[in-house]
């Protein structure tokens, strides 16, 4: 007869307990520590750095192995939902840009253009953005893995997957086993999320605080309000259009189990393993989500479209530049295209603002001052943007899979 020690029972309960509740506890403790002792809060920031680093380390390998395994083991005639998911990604991004235009006209914001981010070089035009994306596709596979170039990783994974379809069953089984092993490592890393978020919250509050954000309160309200509208109204409408049933159980599940992580890690790449685990929990098709989730992390950028649009129009309002309806609609298209290319640009959505500003004849030095404002409010803006982007990847993947499988739509959210 074996006896369990109290410590082993405690660890077992901790490992099997509700991750969301543990994260909330970590969040509250992080806030309290930042209020009580700033040096201690900064010190425990190492926990957050380690957690984000672990997610970023495992994500490229996870994407490579899952995509390669799913394509190599794909059976001829087996249906996937990649096309409808891709359509939802593009439609969602454009809808977000339109929403941002509407919000910017209803609640016009102005900026204090005093400093410029001179050390950063933005892309000169949409052609350069597209060129960057194409060059990412032909990246060396080792370089793509080392630098977390997910576009390059996807291209190599798809190519190797198709090539390995002609391999023998032993090879395919080996790749499948490796992908399962990597998935297990991801699950272990995710269990440390409460500690990671505890460290991230405490160090962020201790080092930056929120004093600097008050000067841009209206701009932040427009940005965050627009993102909330997209997350809680626009996206549910798109999901309802696909699954023809109440979308909110799925929407809230994705926000709770994907958006919360993304908000604190502020990295779509780091959130790929989290989204993969959520899709597995929802019993979605592995062949579909193993491709759509990393693809979404590179092109599904509703939050980026909102950031580019709102900050560009804030600069326009500050400079008293008149904007007519056709120009505003064109900005929505440009912002959507820029957002889809944000993953191919160092600095992401903020450094694509000068490209959109160029539409209105705004000089580059002024546009870079807008970028500087973006960095000032980045503590909150980047967190909300990433939460919207990443949770939408899982949401649209689930919606498309449920639209194909009615039984899945009925059962996926039970329990």
UniProtKB/Swiss-Prot annotation:
- State the organism of origin: Klebsiella pneumoniae subsp. pneumoniae (strain ATCC 700721 / MGH 78578)
The UniProt entry, under Gene3D superfamilies, shows: Sodium:dicarboxylate symporter
Main localization of the protein described in the UniProt heading: membrane
Keyword field: Amino-acid transport, Cell inner membrane, Cell membrane, Membrane, Symport, Transmembrane, Transmembrane helix, Transport
Which GO molecular function entries does the Swiss-Prot or TrEMBL record give? neutral L-amino acid:sodium symporter activity
Q: What is this protein called?
A: Serine/threonine transporter SstT
Q: Biological process GO annotation list?
A: serine transport; threonine transport
Gene behind the chain: sstT
Q: Which InterPro entries match?
A: Na-dicarboxylate_symporter, Na:dicarbo_symporter_sf, Ser_Thr_transp_SstT
- Any single Gene Ontology cellular-component annotation: plasma membrane
Name the membrane topology term.
Answer: Multi-pass membrane protein
Residue ranges annotated as transmembrane are 23-43, 47-67, 85-105, 144-164, 181-201, 220-240, 293-313, 333-353
- Protein's cellular compartments: Cell inner membrane
The reactions it catalyses are: L-serine(in) + Na(+)(in) = L-serine(out) + Na(+)(out); L-threonine(in) + Na(+)(in) = L-threonine(out) + Na(+)(out)
Q: What does this protein do?
A: Involved in the import of serine and threonine into the cell, with the concomitant import of sodium (symport system).
Which family does the entry's similarity section mention?
Answer: Belongs to the dicarboxylate/amino acid:cation symporter (DAACS) (TC 2.A.23) family.
Q: Which domain of life is it from?
A: Bacteria
């Amino acid at each position: 007869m074996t006896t369990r020690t109290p410590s082993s029972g405690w660890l077992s309960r901790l490992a099997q307990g509700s991750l969301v509740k543990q994260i909330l506890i970590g969040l509250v403790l992080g806030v309290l520590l930042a209020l009580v002792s700033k040096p201690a809060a900064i010190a425990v920031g190492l926990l957050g750095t380690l957690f984000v680093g672990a997610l970023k380390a495992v994500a490229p390998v996870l994407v490579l192995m899952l995509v390669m395994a799913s394509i190599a083991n794909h059976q001829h005639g087996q249906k996937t939902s990649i096309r409808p998911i891709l359509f939802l990604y593009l439609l969602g991004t454009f809808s977000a840009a339109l929403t941002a235009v509407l919000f910017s006209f209803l609640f016009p914001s102005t900026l204090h253009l005093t400093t410029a981010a001179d050390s950063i070089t933005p892309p000169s035009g949409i052609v350069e953005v597209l060129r960057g994306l194409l060059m990412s596709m032909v990246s060396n596979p080792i370089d793509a893995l080392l630098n977390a170039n997910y576009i390059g990783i996807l291209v190599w994974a798809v190519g190797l997957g198709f090539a390995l379809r002609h391999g023998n069953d032993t090879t395919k089984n080996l790749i499948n086993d490796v992908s399962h092993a990597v998935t297990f490592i991801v699950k272990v890393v995710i269990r440390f999320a409460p500690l990671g978020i505890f460290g991230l919250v405490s160090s962020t509050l201790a080092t930056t605080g929120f004093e600097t954000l008050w000067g841009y309160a209206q701009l932040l309200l427009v940005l965050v309000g627009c993102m909330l509208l997209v997350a809680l109204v626009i996206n549910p409408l798109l999901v309802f259009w696909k699954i023809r049933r109440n979308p909110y159980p799925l929407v809230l599940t994705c926000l709770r189990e994907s958006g919360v992580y993304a908000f604190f890690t502020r990295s779509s790449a780091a959130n790929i393993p989290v989204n993969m685990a959520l899709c597995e929990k929802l019993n979605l098709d592995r062949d579909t989500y193993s491709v759509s989730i990393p693809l979404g992390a590179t092109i599904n950028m509703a939050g980026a479209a909102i950031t580019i649009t709102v900050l560009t129009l804030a600069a326009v309002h500050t400079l008293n530049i008149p904007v007519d309806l056709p120009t505003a609609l064109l900005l929505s298209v440009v912002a959507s295209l820029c957002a889809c290319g944000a993953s191919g640009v160092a600095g992401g959505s903020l450094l694509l603002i000068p490209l959109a500003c160029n539409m209105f004849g705004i000089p580059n030095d002024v546009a870079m001052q807008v970028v500087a404002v973006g960095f000032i409010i980045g503590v909150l803006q980047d967190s909300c943007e990433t939460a919207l982007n990443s949770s939408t990847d899982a949401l649209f993947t689930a919606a498309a899979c449920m639209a194909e499988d009615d039984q899945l739509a009925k059962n996926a959210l039970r329990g």
